[in-house]
Every structure is written in C-alpha cells, then in structure tokens.
Curated annotation (Swiss-Prot):
Residues 269-282, 289-299 have a biased composition (Basic and acidic residues). The keyword Transferase applies. Belongs to the methyltransferase superfamily. RsmH family. CDD domains: AdoMet_MTases. It comes from Thermotoga maritima (strain ATCC 43589 / DSM 3109 / JCM 10099 / NBRC 100826 / MSB8). Transmembrane segments: none annotated. It catalyses: cytidine(1402) in 16S rRNA + S-adenosyl-L-methionine = N(4)-methylcytidine(1402) in 16S rRNA + S-adenosyl-L-homocysteine + H(+). The gene is rsmH. This is Ribosomal RNA small subunit methyltransferase H. It is an enzyme of class 2 (transferase). It comes from the Bacteria. PANTHER family: 12S RRNA N4-METHYLCYTIDINE METHYLTRANSFERASE (PTHR11265:SF0), S-ADENOSYL-METHYLTRANSFERASE MRAW (PTHR11265). The keyword Cytoplasm applies.
C-alpha cells in the first residue's frame, strides 16, 4: 500500500444517520465504503445493524478493513463497483436491503496518498483510476484522445464553459503529458492570467475533475446504479446520496423526482453546517439528498 498518513474525516455523518435511520437487524449497503468512516459511525450508532461495504479501490478497502475490524461480525467488505451491487447481493442471497449510502467523489487517501494522480498539488503519474485494475488512465486519455473529444470532456464534465477548447489545444500541444504537473502546466498556459487570478479554487480544478470523471465513468455508473437502487430497497428503506458537484447532484435529483417508488425526504439538498466546514473544509461542497422506498402499491 502506498505511503499515507492523513486521517480521513467522513462528511455529514450526523445527517447521514438522521436520514438513513439504521435500526437493529437491518442491512445497510455502503456503496462507497472508502476508508470506512461512515460505516464505522453507523455501526457505532446502531449496535445491531449489519453493513455490506463495497468499493472499487482495493487500497482504501484495506484501510476500511483495519478501521472496521472490531465490527468484523457485522460488516462484510467487497471489491465491487456499486453498479454491480445487485449481482453481489444476489450472490450473497440477499434480496433487498434496508438502507443505501453513497458518498461520491474522491477520498482523502486517493488525494493524499502517493502516486494516485488525483492531485494538482505535487508531481505524480497521471493515473486517476479509482479501480487500479482498470486499463484506462488519465495519461492514456490525455495523450491519445483527439483534441475535439478532450474539449468536449472538459466542457461537459469539468463545466469549463469558456476555456475548454483552449485547454484541449494546449494539452495536445504539450504532448506527451506524463505527470500531474504536466497537466497543470498545460492548463496554466491555456488560461488568461486574469482568469487564473479570478478563480477562487485552483485554476486546474475543473480540468482535473473532468478527466477523473471520464477515466472512472463516474456519471454513467451513477445513472446506471440509481435506476435499480429503488428495487434493492425494502419498503421503508432509505437511500442517502452525498454528491460534491452539480453534475452528480442533478442526476440524483432527477432520478429521485422521476421515480414512482421513492418518496423524496429532502426537497432541497442538505448542506453541511458552518461548524463542520470549519473543521473539515472538504465538506464545503457536499450536498445530501435522501429518499424512502414507498410501500408496494403505495402513493
């Protein structure tokens, strides 16, 4: 496992437990178990519930296993994409669960651990894979895709509305790109100096987000899973999703709104408290939405 020393702080734990309402004898599916922070909080809050935790990142799963070892009789961890959660449950002989949790985005380990390529703060290989067994890396995408396709990805997935074409052009001009700082350099060269000064966040944030989403098929996977999530829940079971940018939040909002089997519990997304943001700045962009599976034949 790569070197890593920073503690992961799960986001909006109080709100997750409030909306998920875990109870004894109930089964919770943690679709993005990550380093195990939310699962641990749920298990501590509910001494009789059980967690099935899944993640595509084998490295964070090892961290979760260590963090949750005292609950080993009530937690089962699997290296599986949440889009395949229905097949996993079937394999385990579980027809439905009582709660589903999704904490989308990048974990602290993925950002701060060495050589994952998610960060623009230091030089690392251009990887960005959450599943290290996947063949598609950021380096492959940036060096092989046509300029027009790169511009589309940066425009759509990074919401880089004004400068996507300029950034894509600089990426192509700077090929081959091998490290995260190579990508930062290309973005810096593409943006006017006034735009770099104007931005509140790092000027390469949107481009890094776009490439990461594309490499990991994040939006496609989210859409695919949410379509079937309602059928994985027992009546009265709840789904709680924390997203970190508007693209994810829009998918969650529209899926909940269009479902005939879910009752929306959060008319507007719940945001973290000011106190939590002070203690954990990563929580700032978090948006939580929740819904409940209605009874069969219910309104």
């Amino acid at each position: 496992m790569r070197k890593y020393s920073q503690r992961h702080i799960p986001v909006m734990v109080r709100e997750v437990i409030e909306f998920l309402k875990p109870e004894d004898e109930k089964i919770i599916l943690d679709c993005t178990v990550g380093e195990g922070g939310h699962s641990r909080a749920i298990l501590e809050h509910c001494p009789g519930c059980r967690i099935i935790g899944i993640d595509v990142d084998s490295e964070v799963l090892r961290i979760a296993e260590e963090k949750l070892k005292e609950f080993s009789d009530r937690v089962s961890l699997f290296k599986v994409s949440y889009r395949e959660a229905d097949f996993l449950l079937k394999t385990l002989g579980i027809e439905k669960v009582d709660g589903i949790l999704m904490d989308l985005g990048v974990s602290t380990y993925q950002l701060k651990g060495e050589n994952r390529g998610f960060t623009f703060e230091r030089e690392e290989p251009l990887d960005m894979r959450m599943d290290l067994e996947s063949e598609v890396t950021a380096q492959k995408v940036l060096n092989e895709l046509p300029e027009e396709e790169l511009a589309r990805i940066i425009f759509e997935y990074g919401e880089e509305k004004r400068f996507a074409r300029r950034i894509a052009r600089k990426i192509v001009e700077n090929r081959p790109l091998n490290t995260t700082l190579d990508l930062v350099k290309a973005v810096r060269e593409a943006l006017p100096s006034y735009e770099i000064r104007r931005r509140k966040r790092h000027f390469a944030t949107k481009t890094f987000q776009a490439i990461r989403i594309y490499v990991n098929r994040e939006l496609e996977n989210l859409k695919e899973f949410l379509k079937k999530a309602e059928d994985l829940l027992n009546p009265g079971g709840r789904i709680v999703v924390i997203s970190f940018h508007s693209l994810e939040d829009r998918i969650v909002k529209e899926t909940f709104r269009n479902s005939k089997k879910l009752r929306i519990l959060t008319e507007k997304p719940v945001r973290p408290s000011e106190e939590e943001i002070r203690e954990n700045p990563r929580a700032r962009s978090g948006r939580l939405r929740a819904a409940e599976r209605i009874e069969e034949g219910g309104d």
